[in-house]
């Protein structure tokens, strides 16, 4: 009897359609419930929910009740959700994004991320996303790396207990700013199963040496969350689609061919002044790009104000 050769895990099967979402950090001037309703009415299938002052603030009273209400609203609207943790001035009214995992007082950031994990678990989030932070000038690189690994290990343990998937985002200008940096951190943590990568498509064009579709292919096996926006080489500025340098149909094709089933969420945090218009324009663009990539496109949006009605 011939012994069959050992098998290796198969690549995830390709998908025929992608699920588009939108970041609530691009709806900063809307109440959260209003933002969710607008996005569902437009035809989005999910949201990247940034925990912020007016959007499910994890430090305000009645968190459990508010999380439960949002979970029910998401279900009623048919929206998937990922939790984002990049709010500005949430932890410190004087310093944007401080403290990070690299600061002397990193405990405040760790506490926030543990709260985000609990919120993500209660919402049934597909992922909780976070980043390293910018290294403070007085902190040596090796000390910053040690702090990052230690802080991430604590968050990984919390996520593992809660059954939550983490998406770590390389961010230009931060200690971990590219895919190579994510790979280093993943190895340093012992390659935990719950620690995936959040890939911002614009960042790939901004600073990666590979093409954007190749970046997608490089991380396909670890990809748990996707942010999408246009960008130009060497400039970290989130742009509306069609105003940067990215050719999107090959990017969407690479996501589908890699078997990615998570949300592909528009990331335009500086466009809240025209949020509904920009969100509508963005979805039209993505649907057109998906068709050009040979992918199926979701049903057209229902008339405004009717989503979730009895």
Task: Show which residues each predicted segment covers.
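Histidine-acidic metal/acid-base catalytic patches
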Residues: 2-21, 28-45, 71, 75, ...
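Active-site beta-loop-alpha junctions enriched in small/polar residues
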Residues: 23-27, 52-54, 86-88, 133-135, ...
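Structural motif corresponding to the early beta-alpha repeats
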Residues: 45, 51-146, 271
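Short helix-to-loop capping/linker segments positioned immediately adjacent to catalytic or ligand/cofactor-binding
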Residues: 143, 156, 171-173
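Histidine/acidic residue-rich metal-binding segments in metalloenzymes
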Residues: 151-157
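Conserved Rossmann-fold SDR core element
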Residues: 162-167
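Active-site-proximal segments of metal-dependent phosphoesterases and phosphodiesterases across multiple
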Residues: 176
């Amino acid at each position: 009897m011939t012994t069959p050769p050992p098998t290796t895990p198969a690549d995830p099967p390709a998908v025929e359609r992608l699920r588009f979402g939108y970041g609530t950090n691009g709806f900063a001037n809307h109440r959260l419930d209003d933002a969710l309703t607008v996005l569902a009415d437009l035809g989005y299938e999910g949201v990247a929910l940034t925990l912020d002052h007016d959007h499910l603030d994890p430090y305000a009273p009645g968190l459990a009740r508010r999380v439960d209400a949002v979970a029910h609203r998401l279900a009623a609207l048919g929206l998937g959700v990922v939790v984002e943790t990049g709010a500005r001035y949430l932890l410190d009214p004087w310093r944007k994004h401080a403290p990070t995992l690299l600061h002397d007082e990193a405990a405040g950031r760790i506490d926030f991320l543990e709260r985000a994990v609990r919120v993500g678990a209660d919402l049934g989030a597909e992922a909780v996303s976070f980043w390293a932070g910018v290294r403070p000038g007085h902190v040596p690189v090796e000390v910053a790396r040690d702090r990052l690994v230690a802080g991430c290990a604590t968050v990984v343990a919390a996520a593992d207990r809660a059954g939550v998937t983490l998406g770590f985002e390389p961010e230009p200008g931060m200690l971990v700013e590219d895919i190579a940096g994510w790979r280093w951190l993943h190895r340093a943590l012992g390659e935990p199963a719950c620690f995936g990568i959040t890939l911002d498509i614009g960042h790939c064009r901004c600073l990666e040496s590979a093409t954007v579709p190749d970046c997608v292919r490089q991380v396909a096996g670890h990809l748990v969350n996707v942010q999408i926006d246009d960008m130009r080489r060497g400039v970290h500025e989130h742009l509306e689609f069609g105003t940067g340098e990215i050719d999107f149909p090959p990017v969407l094709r690479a996501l589908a061919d890699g078997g990615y089933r998570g949300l592909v969420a528009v990331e335009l945090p500086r466009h809240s002044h025209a949020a509904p218009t920009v969100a509508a324009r963005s979805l039209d663009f993505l649907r057109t790009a998906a068709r050009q990539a040979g992918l199926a496109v979701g049903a057209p949006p229902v008339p405004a104000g009717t989503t979730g009605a009895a």
